[in-house]
A protein has these predicted regions:
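N-terminally biased helix-coil "hinge/interface" segments that flank
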Residues: 1-252
Length: 252
C-alpha cells in the first residue's frame, strides 16, 4: 500500500518557458502599471536599442487604482474600492482568467491588498486571485510583482492538472495527500500548490538535483555536475559535498 505520492512536474515551468499560461490582469497602485516592464537595470543587451522584454501581462490588462502606503506601511491614500470593482469588471470583459493584486509597499502592510482581494472574491468568477504580499512578502516591487504575475499566469494550468491527478488517485483508492515538489527541493500538498503554483516552477530540475545528490552519495561521489534534459529545457546543477547549491533568485 502506498503511504505517499510525491510528484515532480514541469507543467508550471513549461507554461512560462513556452508562454502557454493564462491571460492575466493586474491591479496596481496608480502610476505603477509599467513596473513589470521597467524592472531593474538589467537589460537583454547592455548597448544599443536592441533586445526586448515582454511581461507576462499585457499593458492593456494592467490597470491602476487610487491607493498609497509609505515604506513603513502607513496609509497615505485610502484604497478606492469602487475603482477596484471597476478594474475587475474591465479585466473580466477583456478576457482575463486570473488577476494579480500588487500595491506599492504591501510587504510592510498588506491591508489594501487584502481588502482588494476580498472585493475580488465576490467579483471574480474564476477565483484565480494572486496577492503579491501572500506570494512574496519582501521589499522590491518588481520582484514581488513579477513573482505574483508568474503565479497568476500558471495557476489555471496547474490547478486543472493537479485536480485531474488527484481525482485519478482517489479513483484508484489512494487516500493520502498528494505531495508536489517545490523549486526549493521540498514538497507541499496539492491544494497548497494550486494556491501558489509559482512554488513549483523549476521543481522538476530541483527534484533531479536532489535525486542526483542522493544517488551520488550512495555511490561514493559527493561532488557532481548533474544534467537534466527534457523536451523543453536542459538544466545543469552543481553538487558539492553531496549538497545541491541553493539560490534565493531565479530568472526565466
Amino acid at each position: 500500500e502506498l503511504a505517499a505520492v510525491v510528484h515532480g512536474t514541469t507543467i508550471a515551468t513549461n507554461a512560462v518557458l513556452e508562454r502557454k499560461g493564462a491571460r492575466c490582469g493586474l491591479i496596481t497602485t496608480r502610476g505603477f502599471r509599467d513596473i513589470l516592464e521597467l524592472g531593474r537595470r538589467t537589460r537583454p543587451n547592455n548597448y544599443g536599442m536592441t533586445g526586448s522584454f515582454e511581461p507576462l501581462i499585457d499593458r492593456e490588462l494592467r490597470l491602476e487604482v487610487s491607493e498609497r502606503l509609505d515604506a513603513r506601511g502607513r496609509i497615505l491614500l485610502p484604497l478606492d474600492e469602487d475603482e477596484v470593482r471597476t478594474a475587475l469588471k474591465t479585466l473580466h470583459e477583456l478576457g482575463a482568467e486570473a488577476v494579480v493584486i500588487h500595491f506599492l509597499h504591501a510587504y510592510a502592510n498588506p491591508v489594501h491588498e487584502q481588502r482588494a482581494a476580498e472585493i475580488a472574491r465576490t467579483n471574480w468568477p474564476t477565483g484565480f486571485i494572486s496577492i503579491s504580499s501572500d506570494i512574496l512578502r519582501e521589499v522590491r516591487e518588481f520582484e514581488r510583482g513579477s513573482t505574483a504575475a508568474v503565479n497568476a499566469y500558471v495557476q489555471p494550468v496547474l490547478s486543472s492538472y493537479l485536480s485531474r491527478i488527484s481525482d485519478r488517485l482517489q479513483e484508484a483508492g489512494f487516500g493520502h495527500d498528494l505531495l508536489v515538489m517545490q523549486g526549493n527541493g521540498g514538497t507541499l500538498t496539492a491544494p497548497a500548490a494550486a494556491r501558489q503554483p509559482v512554488q513549483t516552477v523549476m521543481s522538476g530540475p530541483a527534484a533531479g538535483a536532489v535525486a542526483a545528490a542522493h544517488i551520488g552519495q550512495q555511490s561514493g561521489f559527493d561532488n557532481l555536475i548533474a544534467c537534466d534534459m527534457g523536451g523543453t529545457s536542459f538544466d545543469v546543477s552543481v553538487i558539492v559535498g553531496a549538497t545541491p547549491s541553493l539560490s534565493a533568485e531565479k530568472d526565466l
